[in-house]
A protein has these predicted regions:
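Low-complexity, compositionally biased segments
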Residues: 41-42, 136, 217
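Signature of small four-pass
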Residues: 2-129, 179-203, 207
């Protein structure tokens, strides 16, 4: 397979991932599937727009560039005859690096969100992040904490500390975990294109010379 054809496959894979990441980020603005009355009730990491900006908007640009590489002929790229195939592959490296940065940003935001937990209505009728500010551990009985992990990721009994929205911990973990995994996949795909682009820029694509009819498709 030519470098351009392989890049097109990567671009096709990035598009649905970017759409899913945007969708997950939008759903996070509705904790537990509910419309909140105060924006302060939304988990802070949601406002960093990791899925919308990092894995969404920034990922569209490299995806479109990867898709266009297959259509570049051997004499030029994007209709410009002064621009060769190797320059097109070199340009894709820059956009692939941009994709890695965007996916990395989304990955870091998602990892922090999973670690900190959601904002919810605590048992003392205050909206807070009980798993991050230590509030939940004040409710934890001594003997219970001795024999059960105090990290909410491992001790599901702590999830009951969140009264509202209903099922917010599951909602939070599911969506941010999806963003975590998908952003990691995006970063890997873009990193692969960096290598593919280097090969294409140094060695050239596998298509024939300008005007050749026996080049690879």
């Amino acid at each position: 397979m030519c470098s351009g054809g392989f890049a097109k496959c990567l671009g096709i894979s990035l598009i649905p991932l970017a759409i899913l990441c945007v969708f997950c980020n939008i759903l996070l603005f509705f904790p537990g599937g509910m419309i909140v009355s105060d924006n302060a009730h939304i988990t802070p990491e949601v406002w960093y727009f990791g899925g919308i900006l990092g894995s969404g908007v920034l990922m569209i640009f490299p995806a479109l560039v990867f898709l266009g590489l297959k259509n570049n002929d051997c004499c030029g790229c994007c209709g410009n005859e002064s621009c060769g195939k190797r320059f097109a592959m070199f340009t894709s490296i820059i956009f692939a690096a941009l994709g890695v940065l965007g996916a990395g940003y989304s990955f870091i935001v998602s990892a922090v969100a999973v670690h900190n937990g959601p904002t919810c209505l605590f048992y003392n009728e205050t909206w807070t992040n009980p798993f991050n500010d230590g509030s939940v551990y004040q409710k934890c009985f001594l003997f219970h904490c001795l024999f059960h992990p105090v990290d909410y990721l491992y001790n599901h009994t702590l999830w009951d500390s969140c009264k509202e929205p209903v099922g917010i911990v599951t909602w939070h973990l599911t969506l941010f975990s999806m963003l975590l995994v998908m952003s990691l996949i995006q970063a890997v795909l873009c990193a692969i294109q960096v290598i593919n682009g280097l090969i294409g820029a140094i060695c050239g694509d596998c298509c024939g010379c300008c005007g050749s009819t026996d080049g690879a498709v």
